[in-house]
Curated annotation (Swiss-Prot):
Positions of the catalytic residues: C107, C205
Compartment(s) of residence: Cytoplasm
Region (Interaction with target base in tRNA): 102-104
Gene behind this protein: mnmA
Binding positions (ATP): G16, M17, S18, G19, G20, V21, D22, S23, M42, G132
Single Gene Ontology BP annotation: tRNA wobble position uridine thiolation
Native source species: Shewanella sp. (strain MR-4)
EC number: 2.8.1.13
Protein name, per record: tRNA-specific 2-thiouridylase MnmA
Keywords: ATP-binding, Cytoplasm, Disulfide bond, Nucleotide-binding, RNA-binding, Transferase, tRNA processing, tRNA-binding
Taxonomic lineage: Bacteria, Pseudomonadati, Pseudomonadota, Gammaproteobacteria, Alteromonadales
This protein's GO CC annotations: cytoplasm
Length: 372
């Protein structure tokens, strides 16, 4: 494993302790590297504390057990108000507009690396913060800091962190980004940490394991409508466009259609004006393919971004294979991206994140698709 700095004696790091194995091992590794380590547990969601799916109390208990085992302090903080204002309201507004947002990216931007960093600075007098994300940072000789993909390609989380500023990356440490996931679990087991075999969290951060349709229906009124084929034939009913995303295959309720081949049905479009869900057969249906996209709300980790005409790679969703592309700036905040080959299920509202080799450059929000 690569050390983060040559010497760290006396430097204070506040680790975001989630009650999971990644943050647990992050705290241990930083202690081994000579940092003065303390933990901070965030509570970001007030609702449903008695819900069977809400594990906040259990997570706090596990975080405390790990900190006790390591002999470090654990602080707690409630960011529920900030979360509601800066993450959840954005989430609802995007769904209401017919887009598919990624609230975990907004959570990292507004909560984990903003509210958390401010609290660590102002209240806990931190030199650095640290998280259990699978990314790396690289400090260059010219004083710049870059964010790199995590060593574990299957766990790399740079896609979710592209909105971080250069300053935020420079103040953050990512110890497990240098490791494979199995190595992290092995370290936790060797150290006797209670989280060593705890399963990874899944789902949107504030929804957890709950059924998405039930949760969203509590906040946005559903508007049922027709499901049509790309040729205009009505073949079913949907419960609300907000419950569906481009490329979706499961949960459409239209299996076994007469006069159709055996290819599965996919969502290929959402007609907001008519409240119609458009479907087609096959994962490479023409209506599902894009030759490029317009990306806005641009953010570059190094502030300046890639040069006009750059040939780099992009991801339009998490764990997607790299997509070679060429960039053209339409203005300071809008980028035209042309793919080398057509790509399926590019989804407005999701994030497009750009890479030059192992360096995460930044990205933006997918606004429009380029077809034909």
């Amino acid at each position: 494993m690569t050390s983060i700095e040559p010497t760290h004696t006396g430097k204070k790091v506040i680790v975001g302790m989630s009650g999971g194995v990644d943050s647990s091992v992050s705290a241990y590794l930083l202690m081994q590297q000579g940092y003065q380590v303390e933990g901070l547990f965030m509570k970001n969601w007030e609702e449903d504390d008695n819900d069977e799916y809400c594990a906040a109390a259990e997570d706090l208990k596990d975080a405390q057990a790990v900190c006790d085992k390591l002999g470090i302090k654990l602080h707690t903080v409630n960011f529920a108000a900030e979360y509601w204002d800066n993450v959840f309201e954005y989430f609802l507004a995007e769904y209401k507009a017919g887009r598919t947002p990624n609230p975990d990216i907004m959570c990292n931007k507004e909560i984990k690396f903003k509210a958390f960093l401010d609290f660590a600075d102002d209240i806990l007098d931190a030199d650095y913060i640290a998280m259990g994300h699978y990314v790396r940072r690289r400090d260059n000789a010219d004083g710049t800091t870059q964010m790199l993909r995590g060593v574990d390609n299957n766990k790399d989380q740079s896609y979710f962190l592209y909105t971080l500023s250069h300053e935020q990356v420079a103040r953050s440490l990512f110890p497990v980004g240098e490791l494979e996931k199995h190595e992290v679990r092995e370290i936790a087991k060797k150290m006797g940490l209670i989280t060593h075999d705890k399963k990874d969290s899944t789902g949107i951060c504030f929804i957890g394991e709950r059924k998405f349709t039930e949760f969203l229906g509590n906040y946005l009124p559903a508007q049922p409508g027709n499901i049509e084929t790309a040729e205009g034939e009505v073949i079913g009913k949907h419960q609300g466009l907000m419950y569906h995303t481009l490329g979706q295959r499961k949960g459409l309720g239209i299996g076994g259609m007469k006069n159709s081949n055996d290819d599965p049905w996919y969502v290929v479009d959402k007609d907001l004006k008519r409240n119609v869900l458009v479907v087609g057969q096959g994962g490479h249906h023409p209506r599902l393919m894009s030759n490029g996209m317009l990306v806005n709300q641009l953010h570059w980790v190094d502030r300046k971004g890639p040069a006009e005409g750059s040939q780099i790679v992009v991801k339009t969703r998490y764990r997607q294979q790299d997509i070679p592309c060429t960039l053209t700036y339409l203005d300071d905040n809008t980028l035209k991206v042309v793919f080398d080959e057509p790509v399926a299920a590019v989804t407005p509202g999701q994030s497009a994140v750009f890479y030059d080799g192992e360096v995460c450059l930044g990205g933006g929000i997918i606004d429009q698709l380029i077809r034909g």
